[in-house]
Structure formats: structure tokens, C-alpha cells
Amino acid sequence: MRLTSGIFHAAIAVAAVGAVLPEGPSSSKTHRNEYARRMLGSSFGIPKNQTFDYLVIGGGTAGLTIATRLAEQGVGSVAVIEAGGFYELNNGNLSQIPAQDAFYVGTDLDDWQPGIDWGFHTTPQAGAYDRVSHYARGKCLGGSSARNYMAYQRGTKAAHQRWADTVGDSSYTWEQFLPFFEKSLHFTPANDALRGANASVVSDPSVLGNGDGPLSVTYPHYAQAFATWAKHAFIEIGLQIRSGFQSGALLGQSYGLYTINATTMHRESSETSFLRKGLADPNLTVFQSALAKRIRFQDKRAVGVDVETMGRAYTLSARKEIVLSAGAFQSPQLLMVSGVGPAATLKAHNIPLVADRPGVGQNMQDHIIYAPSYRVNVITQSALLNEEFEAQANRDYNERAAGIYANPTSDILAWEKIPEPKRSAWFSNHTRQVLAEYPDDWPEVEFLTMGGYFGYQRNYIRDNPSDGYNYASLAVSLCTPRSRGNVTITSPDAGVPPVINPNWLTDPVDVELAVAAFKRTRDFFNTTAIKPILIGPEYFPGSQVATDAEILDHVRKSFDTIFHASCTCAMGLANDTQAVVDSKARVIGVEALRVVDASALPFLPPGHPQSTLYALAEKIACEISGNC
């Protein structure tokens, strides 16, 4: 799209943060005077040796949440160490506009943007014919909440019971964890007048908090026409309409709730929500463009972090604790280069051993995604390639915070267990037995209606057909991943990228489910409800992909991750040698160090983990401060 006025507004918004800080008497907790508090720069650190009460490594989804809450809850001074900067400034407005969420996330190694992304790539993947893929990760304030697809939904009640059982802590049950979900939120109901016809939303606001949280969640001011037809097709194949996916149940379909600012329709991230709030607190300091290189220990107590900013090395020290929130790849990497991890790995790189934790970097879990695409006779995001349509969409977004740019491409989310009799026909006895181990409310497959073309997912923008047709897709994601990957290091230097091996689609259960899920998309497109809007047969991959072997071949060539890497510093019981943190997120075997991000999850819950990470950060902040 053309650059809208959004980037100018973003720059002004960032630059003006200091000007809107609350006035009042100077805090007794700080020596800053009131005039200094009104300057943006007062909230940001400069590269030199300093000491704070708490250090948070990583300014991403969980990192900015826990840092802001700790400062707010009066624990003392808090510093955030973030390698990136403001995505609004480093990526134009592409990171702000919901419809632009597919920029720089393809599997091609050159489909990345160094201003906001780490440029990580995987090892050759056996489950994808040895393909090496770019794995998008947010290198910016907001982290991957600035890069994701903005879906906000929660796991199931039984998944939370399994979490509580796995870590031996009842505070992770649905009933006890729900308040931490609610604490973050500022929910705004759907604006049906702007969404358009036949797109009304059924939701349950009773579980969406009291509205005083900083994180805006709402429904886009535009609904894709494809979705209005898709909901009837879902009903035809057995997926009934639910009142949203926030109440601990997922089986069925609903319009998705998204982390979008309800007024501007800009992306909402931990930076636009928690950090903007936190900058008003004189006890919060942010070090941007600051790469954490190593955690320092005295005996087994974490006491500081070696940091590098633009070639300058310095140390930030912690009086009380350090919270590691660098994500599923770099949290285990930082632990290992600091001496916490598998002893053999550390020895191979001459890293002094602080604690032998074999599970560091292991147990990686992730969700994959792929989709067939059809030509359709309704407007989708394909129409943005038409200059006249795009110009009107631009005006709608800038002038009314509405129109197709307000929509993040996906609309309806739906979950199911593969139903009978297809289940018995499609699955081996082994696969049926393994899937039976999951709770009754845990779905096996997620469907996402997508108003656009999917293809091989190498570069969504480059590969988008420009033939004048509108395209729509039904994406599928596997919710019971059995394949396990790992993360390791090749150097004691945290500046050297970690080795990332997701090991996708290598377990036979995942393989059978991947084929079955693709067949279910064809069930969907064969319904009488969806037929009226289809132009011709399946466009991608096409009817020549027919047998199970051909479907699997296609899936291996076309799938990508939906960027839910997790569990590489898994939570568990202290006597579990594969566990890295306990139920309070404390690293086992050392003191004054916690891990709070997706790497700390004991397993990957069904769906999109963003909501869980915000809630986990809220929970651990309360554990630390004791002031909730």
C-alpha cells in the first residue's frame, strides 16, 4: 500500500509520550524532578554500568508486561534490556496496520526486515524435504506481539488442569488463572455498523475483565465477505457458533477477537499498551538497542547482565532478581552461554558450568499452518492490488479507522476434533490411541478463514497473484503437535544466532493429522453453503493433489509455522530433569533468576498463546511483588 499518514502519527505518538505523563508531586522513589519526568528521554537508559532492583531481559510480549507491572506494584527500580527499538519507526506503518501482518514473515530466507526481525532461520527440516526456513521473531519493543497475527483467544479448561497437574500447582487451573487473563484487558465490543452486513459477533464479555487493563482487544471494523459465507459452511460440516473463545472452550466457530486498538484500528502490542502506560512510572527504565550477552552469577545467584549497545559493553546489576524474557529461542541461548544448560553442551564451548539443566533448549513445540486457495466472487484482500480500490481503502482507514485495512486477513476461527466416521477411516489405531490421550475439550485442528491467497508461504507479498481475481483460503493449524524440536548454540557469544531445529512434521501422528486436516478443508469447500461464491475448482494446490501421499507431499512443500515456538525452558517439578523452571518461573538450580515467556510453558496449549503469555506475566509479577 501507499504509506498512509499512520507513520507520521506513530512517530508523533512515540515522541510525545513524555509530554502526556501525569503531573504531580515528585515521587519519593526517585530523584528525578517533575520536569525531567515529562521528557521522553527520562524513561530510557544510556549505555553505562548501573544498578537496579530488577532487570528484565527482553522487551517483548511478556517482558514489557512484567516490567510495567513490577514498577507499578512498587518493587523498586526496574530496567528492561531490549535489542530492538520502536517498530513504528523502524518498519514504517507496516507493523501497525492489521492487514499488513503478512509482510516479512515468509519462509524465504530473504523475506525479513532487519529493523524489526532477528533474521533467524531453521536447520534443514526433514519434515519439509530439508527446507531451511526463515523464522520471524520480533526484534523490537513489543517483541513478537508486534509481529504476530493479533489473535486473542484462550486455551481450554482441561488444558489448564493439565498445566496445574504437570507443575504441581493448582494456581494454573482455569478458575485460578482466569483473573490474570482478565487483568490485562480493555475490551471494546464489536462495532456492527462499521463491520458490515451479516457479520454480527456473539461474545461473552463477562470473562473479559472490567475494562481497566491497558491491552485493547476488540473486533476489526471490517469483516471479510468470505467469512460471512464461511460461517454457514462450518455449520454444514458440524462446527456450531460459539460465544467467543475466552471462556475455556474452543470446539466450534466464532469471529476472532484481536489485539487491536478499538479507536484507531492500529495493532495493539505490549509496547503500545503496557510500555506506554509504564513510561509514566519513574521507576521503569528501558534500554533499547541493547543486546544482553550474558547473565552474571555470584556462586549460583544471578546478579547482573553483560550488555552491548552499538559496540559498547557495559554491565547492568540487579539487587533483587533478573527476569529472562527473550523468547523461545534466545532465553535458552542466554541460559546456556551463561552456564545454565546441558553440561556437555557447555563443556563443548568452554562455558563454566553454573547449573546442569539438560532440558534447556529441549522440548520445543510449535504449530504449523497451510491452506488451499480458491478464486471467489466476493471482495478479499486480493482487491488491494487494484489501485482504485486501494485508494478508497486507504481513505477508509485513515479517515474512519475502518475498511479492509482494519482487518488482519483472518476473521472466523474454528476448532474441532476430526469427527467420525472420518476419524476411523483416516487414522491408524496408533494415531487414534495417541489423540485419545488429550482431554475432550482439546481440539486437534484449527481452521482460519483467510481473505487472501496462501500458496507456498515463501513471500506472501511477492507471490500474491496479480491476475485480477479475488482469492480466499481456509488455513489449518495442528493443535496437538507431537514432533519435538530443540534449540542449541554454536558459540559462547549470544550475538551468534542460536541453532533452531523445530523438527516439524516428523512424528507419524502429526503426519496423519496433517493429511486429515487438509481433507477437512475440502469438505468445507464442497458444502452447498460456500459453493455460490467459488469461481471454478480448487486453485491451489488443485485437484491433481488427490491421494493421501500427494496431499502429504503438498503439505511438506507448503507449510510454515504460525510462530508459536515454545517450551524450550519448560516449567515442571523440581525433580524432573527436563524441567528448567518451577511453577513460580524460577530457574531450578540457581537463585534470583526467572524465565517468563513462551519458553517457560510446560506444553503448547491449543490455539494462539499470546493471551496466555500476557496472563503468565501478570501472574509472575504478582508472585514477585506480593502486591496484587
UniProtKB/Swiss-Prot annotation:
Binding site for FAD: T61, A62, E82, A83, N148, Y149, M150, A151, A598, P609, Q610
Predominant cellular place of this UniProt entry's protein: cytoplasm
Enzyme class, first EC level, given as a word: oxidoreductase
Family per record: Belongs to the GMC oxidoreductase family.
Signal sequence annotation: 1-19
Metabolic or biological pathway, per its Swiss-Prot or TrEMBL entry: Mycotoxin biosynthesis; patulin biosynthesis
Subcellular location: Cytoplasm, Cell cortex; Vacuole; Secreted; Secreted, Cell wall
Cofactor dependency: FAD
EC number: 1.1.-.-
PANTHER family assigned: DEHYDROGENASE PKFF-RELATED, GLUCOSE-METHANOL-CHOLINE GMC OXIDOREDUCTASE
Reported function: Patulin synthase; part of the gene cluster that mediates the biosynthesis of patulin, an acetate-derived tetraketide mycotoxin produced by several fungal species that shows antimicrobial properties against several bacteria. PatE catalyzes the last step of the pathway which is the conversion of E-ascladiol to patulin. The pathway begins with the synthesis of 6-methylsalicylic acid by the polyketide synthase (PKS) patK via condensation of acetate and malonate units.
Molecular function in Gene Ontology: flavin adenine dinucleotide binding; oxidoreductase activity; oxidoreductase activity, acting on CH-OH group of donors; polyketide synthase activity
UniProt key word Iron: no
Protein name from the UniProt record: Patulin synthase
Positions annotated as active site in the UniProt record: H564
Glycosylation site residues: N49, N93, N198, N261, N283, N429, N486, N526, N575
Organism: Penicillium expansum (Blue mold rot fungus)
Keywords: Cell wall, Cytoplasm, FAD, Flavoprotein, Glycoprotein, Oxidoreductase, Secreted, Signal, Vacuole
Reactions it catalyzes: (E)-ascladiol + A = patulin + AH2
Phenotypic consequence of gene deletion: Completely abolishes the production of patulin.
GO biological process, one term: patulin biosynthetic process
GO-annotated cellular components: cell cortex; extracellular matrix; extracellular region; vacuole
Highest taxon above the source species: Eukaryota
